[in-house]
Regions:
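Structural motif corresponding to the C-terminal cap of alpha-helices
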Residues: 21-29, 203-210
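GHKL-type ATPase core
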Residues: 1-13, 24-144
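GHKL/Histidine-kinase-like ATPase module
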Residues: 107, 114-116, 122-212
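Short connector loops/turns at beta-strand edges and beta->alpha or beta->beta junctions
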Residues: 22-23, 95, 169-173
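Short basic (Lys/Arg) and small-residue
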Residues: 17
Length: 212
């Protein structure tokens, strides 16, 4: 349905993305190739399974906030003008009838959020007062993971659909952090195998030698 009123459009978008199915990023072909998940189900599931869920969206100097309980709208504030930067604030409390004695594993969550900012340089995330930000993407990730200076400055390559950061250290063995569509692929995959093969082949071709 074509929404003519701009305020209704803003309001409906906030409601749709947080509570209605089939409104995820995968319905935009330009975003689909770089996103992970299933049709935006995640935020809807959190909303439906929370006794308190509050979403506040700030975009293009307009602000909209809505409060839900178990996926149903409880209250909402009218669209207002805002001087804040574009972004989204989400607060929620899981439904104790569903989860009982739940607890958050902060270390796990913070690792996920840290990866998100490395993969989306310039993105700022505030989680319970802890701020996560990366200006240089995977270069910052590799710099943080290294326990000692590398043998040479980190090589950082970034294209439209690929980003690579690589260096060598003094430790024995190899360590990789690979990602696809914003998801940390802890078990590797064909993307990692292809990179390793191309890397070794390039060195062989450059020096015109074969290495085992």
């Amino acid at each position: 349905e074509d929404i003519k009123d701009e305020k209704d459009k803003v309001r409906n978008k906030v409601v749709d993305v947080s509570s209605k199915m089939n409104t995820g990023a995968k319905y935009d072909s330009k975003v689909f190739k770089k996103t992970v998940g299933l049709n935006g189900v995640g935020i809807k599931a959190v909303n439906a399974l929370s006794e308190y869920f509050h979403i506040q969206s700030i975009r293009d100097k307009q602000e909209k906030s809505i409060e839900f309980s178990q996926g149903q709208i409880v209250s909402e504030n009218p669209i207002s003008q805002s001087s804040n930067e574009n972004g989204v604030i989400i607060k929620f409390k899981p439904d104790e009838n569903m989860f009982g004695n739940y607890r958050y594993i902060s270390e796990y969550i913070e690792t996920l959020l840290r990866n998100y900012v490395f993969l989306n340089s310039g993105l700022r995330i505030n989680f319970n007062g802890n701020k996560f930000f990366s200006r240089n993407g995977l270069l910052d990730l590799l710099d943080e993971k290294m326990n000692a200076p590398g043998k040479y400055p980190i090589i950082h390559l970034k294209g439209e659909d690929i980003e690579i950061a690589i260096t060598h250290g003094n430790q024995y063995g190899e360590e990789y952090y690979s990602f696809v569509n914003g998801q940390h692929t802890t078990q590797g995959g064909t993307h990692l195998l292809a990179f390793k093969e191309a890397y070794v082949r390039t060195i062989r071709d450059f020096y015109n030698k074969n290495y085992e």
